Structure formats: structure tokens, C-alpha cells
């Protein structure tokens, strides 16, 4: 059955990559959450999508140039209603300490394709192991060298190739990393029924992103996609129940 992942939490309605968005995503029926991680100036793993703080918080500047003590003072609901003014940027450990008490999948996207954070892989893996969620985590990144490093450091933790491009002989490429998941962009030529079938036959799990149109959700469910990432998990969950 197709797994629903709340992309940055239930980010279509709530401030993305916040504890509120993750909680609402699971409440909406998602099978898992997707989150993004960057490193602060002092090496803390924070959950935020952009390299800069500007778009989603009340602060400005690069995450990498800002100490965590300053990041934690920010309002992480920039652009949202004042009712969310007390929402903060979570640490990865905040999310994992909440998740460990529940039962859902956790896709951690390492945001290290623009800024190559030294030691990010080791820090993320240490946190995953410390909270004993290795069997529930999927590691993904656009930086496939980083994914290969994760494979060497922790071969037992699931990995997925994240891409916005069409990969030539994608199944062979994914196996060479090695990884067992393929996370392509929903509107790319890499997301066809033929590709889905070929990947599944090769035991590669296909989970496209970001799937917000009901017609795309329905197509993936009918094609037997292993999963999808959506900002609106309640819509995808409702469609899945009707299949």
C-alpha cells in the first residue's frame, strides 16, 4: 500500500518543518513525516529547509553563520498567522524524542548539496542511533556522494536517491550508491507507470515529491507507488481510504 509522508509536516496548512506541522501531519493520517536538516554555526542539527533563515523565520542570514542560541529565539512561522508566533525551529533531537514514542516513518533529508556541511552525516547518524529509530528512518539528499558516505557509515539504515532530474539507467545508478529508494520530482519524465513497475521489480521503492494535486495522488496510488510526499496528507489519506 502507498505510504503517505507529510512533506515538512502538514505544511500546506501549518508552518513547515515545525513540531506543530509534524504533529498535524500524523493526526491527518500520514504514515510518516519528511523533514530537512541544516547545521548551525556551532554544529547543532536544526530542522529547516533553506540555507538562509529569511523565508521561514523572523531572523536573517545563513543557518551556518548563526549559533543555535540565536536560532532558537526565532519565530519559525514567518508568513503565517500571529497565532503561531511562539513556534520555534526544532532540533532534530526534538523531533526524534517525540517520534520515538510513536510509530511512523521519518524521512530525513540532508540539505548538503548547496553547502557541504562537514560532519553532517556523522551527526545525523549519531542522533538516529541515540534515539534507536534506525529501522524507521530513511535518509535522502540531492548530494549523492553524501548518500554513499551514509551507506558506508550505516549500511543498515535505508537510503533514497533524491533527484529533480531524469537519471540514466536509474535502477543501476541507485544500486551503485547503494540505495534502495528513488525520490523523483512528481512532474519529471522519471515518474511513469513503466518506471514505477521497473523499479518495483528491482526492489527499489519509489516515492515521488511533492504530490499536491489529487489527480497525481490518485495516479500514484493506482500505479502502486511505494509512497509519496505531500504538503496535504489529509487529502492523500482520504483518497487512499477510498481506493
From Swiss-Prot:
Transmembrane segments: none annotated. GO terms for molecular function: phosphoric diester hydrolase activity. InterPro entries: GP_PDE_dom, PLC-like_Pdiesterase_TIM-brl. GO terms for biological process: lipid metabolic process. Residues 2-240 form the GP-PDE domain. It holds the Pfam family GDPD. Signal peptide: none annotated. SUPFAM superfamilies: PLC-like phosphodiesterases (SSF51695). This is Uncharacterized protein YqiK. It comes from Bacillus subtilis (strain 168). The gene is yqiK.
Amino acid at each position: 500500500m502507498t505510504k503517505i509522508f507529510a512533506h515538512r509536516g502538514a505544511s500546506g496548512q501549518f508552518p513547515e518543518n515545525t513540531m506543530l506541522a509534524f504533529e498535524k501531519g500524523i493526526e491527518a493520517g500520514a504514515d510518516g513525516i519528511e523533514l530537512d536538516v541544516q547545521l548551525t554555526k556551532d554544529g547543532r542539527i536544526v530542522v529547516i529547509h533553506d540555507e538562509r533563515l529569511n523565508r521561514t523565520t523572523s531572523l536573517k542570514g545563513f543557518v551556518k553563520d548563526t549559533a543555535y542560541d540565536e536560532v532558537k529565539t526565532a519565530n519559525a512561522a514567518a508568513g503565517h498567522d500571529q497565532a503561531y508566533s511562539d513556534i520555534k525551529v526544532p532540533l532534530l533531537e526534538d523531533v526524534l524524542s517525540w517520534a520515538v514514542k510513536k510509530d511512523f516513518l521519518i524521512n530525513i533529508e540532508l540539505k548538503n548539496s548547496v553547502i557541504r556541511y562537514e560532519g553532517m552525516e556523522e551527526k545525523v547518524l549519531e542522533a538516529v542511533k541515540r534515539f534507536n529509530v534506525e529501522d524507521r528512518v530513511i535518509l535522502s539528499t540531492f548530494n549523492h556522494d553524501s548518500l554513499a558516505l551514509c551507506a558506508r557509515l550505516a549500511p543498515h539504515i535505508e537510503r533514497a536517491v533524491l533527484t529533480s532530474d531524469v537519471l540514466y539507467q536509474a535502477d543501476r545508478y541507485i544500486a551503485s550508491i547503494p540505495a534502495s529508494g528513488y525520490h523523483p520530482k512528481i512532474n519529471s519524465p522519471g515518474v511513469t507507470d513503466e518506471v514505477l513497475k521497473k523499479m518495483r521489480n528491482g526492489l527499489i521503492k519509489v516515492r515521488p515529491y511533492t504530490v499536491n494535486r489529487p489527480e497525481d495522488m490518485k495516479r500514484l496510488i493506482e500505479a502502486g507507488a511505494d509512497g509519496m510526499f505531500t504538503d496535504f496528507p489529509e487529502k492523500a489519506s482520504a483518497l487512499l481510504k477510498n481506493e
